[in-house]
């Protein structure tokens, strides 16, 4: 159900960190209510990239995306960036009006840079604000370091897994750092 207080969580996997020459290879979204209860999981889409684009990945990306199977999924995917953008937007429009949800995730500014470059209609769907879990992580690390051992990430570097971890991490900080 469409609600302007719902939150859109997003994660991208990319061939690298520079949107000037790296590309999106996976996108996933998840919608929660304002209290962080999951309402719906969106499509998880491998985004096709050419072999020449994939060959530009550094060793970390080759290892990580190869081990997870993402590289193989990208090679056989028929979804380009525009198709993935449109499918994601179609899902989000069922849950959140345009311009209402901040972009939510972990180090989400990096994802937004890629959205701006390769999926501008999706990027514009978000409010200009950010709900970045990494902000709380950095504050907790400095102001209450004793709680840092209480949350461990699996670090699969698969988009939906990363979103679920970001959400769980925010819930952890809400309970143990913000104490709400």
UniProtKB/Swiss-Prot annotation:
CDD domains: Orn (cd06135). Residues 7-170 form the Exonuclease domain. InterPro entries: Exonuclease_RNaseT/DNA_pol3, Oligoribonuclease, RNaseH-like_sf, RNaseH_sf. Keywords: Cytoplasm, Exonuclease, Hydrolase, Nuclease. It comes from the Bacteria. GO terms for molecular function: 3'-5'-RNA exonuclease activity; nucleic acid binding. Its EC number is 3.1.15.-. Pfam families: RNase_T. GO terms for cellular component: cytoplasm. It is found in: Cytoplasm. GO terms for biological process: DNA metabolic process. The active site is at 128. 3'-to-5' exoribonuclease specific for small oligoribonucleotides. Belongs to the oligoribonuclease family. This is Oligoribonuclease. It comes from Pectobacterium atrosepticum (strain SCRI 1043 / ATCC BAA-672). The gene is orn.
């Amino acid at each position: 159900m469409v609600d302007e207080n719902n939150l859109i969580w997003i994660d991208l996997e990319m061939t690298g960190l520079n949107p000037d020459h790296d590309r999106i290879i996976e996108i996933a979204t998840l919608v929660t209510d304002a209290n962080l209860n999951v309402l719906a999981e969106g499509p998880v889409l491998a985004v096709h990239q050419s072999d020449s684009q994939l060959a530009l990945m550094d060793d970390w990306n080759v290892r990580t995306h190869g081990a997870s199977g993402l590289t193989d999924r990208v090679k056989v995917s028929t979804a380009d960036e525009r198709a993935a953008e449109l499918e994601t937007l179609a899902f989000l429009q069922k849950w959140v009006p345009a311009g209402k949800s901040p972009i939510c995730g972990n180090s989400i500014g990096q994802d937004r840079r890629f959205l701006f470059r390769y999926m501008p209609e999706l990027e514009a769907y978000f409010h200009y604000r950010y709900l970045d879990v990494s902000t709380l992580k950095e504050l907790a690390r400095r102001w209450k370091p004793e709680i840092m051992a209480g949350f461990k990430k699996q670090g699969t570097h698969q988009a939906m897994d990363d979103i679920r971890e970001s959400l769980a991490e925010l819930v952890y900080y809400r309970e143990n750092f913000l104490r709400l």
